[in-house]
A protein has these predicted regions:
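Feature captures C-terminal
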Residues: 1-130
Length: 130
């Protein structure tokens, strides 16, 4: 349970594909900024269900080359319902229709692993350098 040591509640929010890209680009800039003062956090967001092809060396706003959801390019105009824990997962400036649930992260993770017993952390490529 080291990934969610405080065991926060699970929340959902509706994000457009464009917001997903903007949020991930912002996160990549805060992790890989050429300006050391722009580096805030030092980690790439963890996600399951997306595959992001990126070029770390590209300038701010141009690192993400492609984003796939369920094997298809995301539609920047379409709205997707996503789950997350804490506003570090999805900042409050993104999305609409936020909802906090009565289930906490550890319980949700246990339920997910029961339903997906073949899941292994190493078998998902969320972020891929191209």
């Amino acid at each position: 349970y080291n990934i969610a040591p405080m065991n926060p509640p699970v929340s959902t929010v509706e994000l457009t594909g464009g917001e997903i890209k903007e949020m991930l680009e912002e996160n990549l800039e805060r992790s890989f900024s050429c300006n050391p003062l722009g580096q805030m956090g030092g980690y790439v967001k963890r996600c399951l269900g997306l595959q992001v092809n990126l070029r770390i060396e590209n300038p701010k706003g141009h690192r993400i080359q492609e984003i796939y959801y369920k094997g298809r390019h995301i539609d920047f105009e379409k709205t997707y319902k996503v789950s997350f824990v804490t506003t570090q997962g999805v900042a409050s400036k993104y999305g609409k229709n936020r909802k906090k649930y009565d289930i906490n992260a550890v319980e949700a993770m246990k339920d997910y692993l029961k339903e997906n017993s073949n899941f292994a952390p190493g078998n998902k490529e969320s972020f891929r350098l191209v």
